[in-house]
């Protein structure tokens, strides 16, 4: 999936809506089925461990409130998919994914990356300028793609790019509700000057969210249809909450801020 149109307004390459969030098409799709899950998870861990992520930071690039809002919103969306999902897993915060998102957000590059990680993780991006009341103003555009999505596969949700980008897109939404993508880590960074499709945006607010295991495997549906929690992986031991296979964790985010 190559480049994307806008969100809160009809967007062409030559028209920038600087007070609205823009999203980049999800270019992290794989051409092969997810048959070697264990190998991919092992490789992802190795690549994240070797990623060039600063060990010491003056401040975190996401607040606790923003992190909780993003995580809770994803689980809310995942628990209310239609048709209902039988194997939708509860999403938890992943510190390593957040650190890798932080490293990429700090580059202020309006593109998916770094390239050596994209084979192993999913990634959603959003950017806006101007004031905003909630971090969800950068996240909800991903969910809004649901109106153009026909389960189980994206139909016409392929924007025609790169010279001009138009047409609906769905891959941000499908990554959000990919059943096995049970970990997320995000970062937000304010870029003083950011090149967004040839236009320099001042003080652009850049959100990067990384997902694992990655979703959007071509030819596969994001989840199985059925009675909620009726097809959860055995590792969940039959635990279910809000239509999600629940891992039984006492906290899925606060430990990162200790």
From Swiss-Prot:
SUPFAM superfamilies: PR-1-like (SSF55797). Keywords: Developmental protein, Glycoprotein, Protease inhibitor, Secreted, Signal. It is found in: Secreted. One of its GO terms (cellular component) is extracellular space. Disulfide bonds: none annotated. Belongs to the CRISP family. This is Peptidase inhibitor 15. The gene is PI15.
């Amino acid at each position: 999936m190559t480049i994307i149109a806008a969100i809160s307004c009809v967007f062409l390459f030559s028209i920038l809506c600087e007070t609205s969030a823009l999203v980049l098409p999800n270019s992290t799709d794989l051409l092969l089925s997810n048959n070697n899950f264990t190998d991919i998870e092992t490789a992802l861990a190795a690549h994240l461990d070797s990623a060039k992520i600063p060990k010491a930071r003056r401040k975190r690039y996401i607040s606790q409130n923003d992190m909780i809002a993003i995580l809770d919103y994803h689980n809310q969306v995942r628990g209310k998919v239609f048709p209902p999902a039988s194997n939708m897993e509860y999403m938890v915060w992943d510190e390593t994914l957040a650190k890798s998102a932080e490293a990429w957000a700090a580059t202020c590059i309006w593109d998916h990356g770094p390239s050596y990680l994209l084979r192993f993780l999913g990634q959603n991006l959003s950017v806006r300028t101007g004031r905003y009341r909630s971090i969800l103003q950068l996240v909800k555009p991903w969910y809004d793609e649901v109106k153009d999505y026909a389960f189980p596969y994206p139909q016409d949700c392929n924007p025609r790019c790169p010279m001009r980008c138009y047409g609906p897109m769905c891959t941000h939404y499908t990554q959000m509700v990919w059943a096995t993508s049970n970990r997320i880590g995000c970062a937000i960074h304010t870029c003083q000057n950011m090149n967004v499709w040839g236009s320099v945006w001042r003080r652009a607010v850049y959100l990067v969210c990384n997902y694992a295991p990655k979703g959007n495997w071509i030819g596969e549906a994001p989840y199985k249809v059925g009675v909620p929690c009726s097809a959860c992986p055995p590792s969940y031991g039959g635990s279910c909450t809000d239509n999600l296979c629940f891992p039984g964790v006492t906290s899925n985010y606060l430990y990162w801020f200790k």
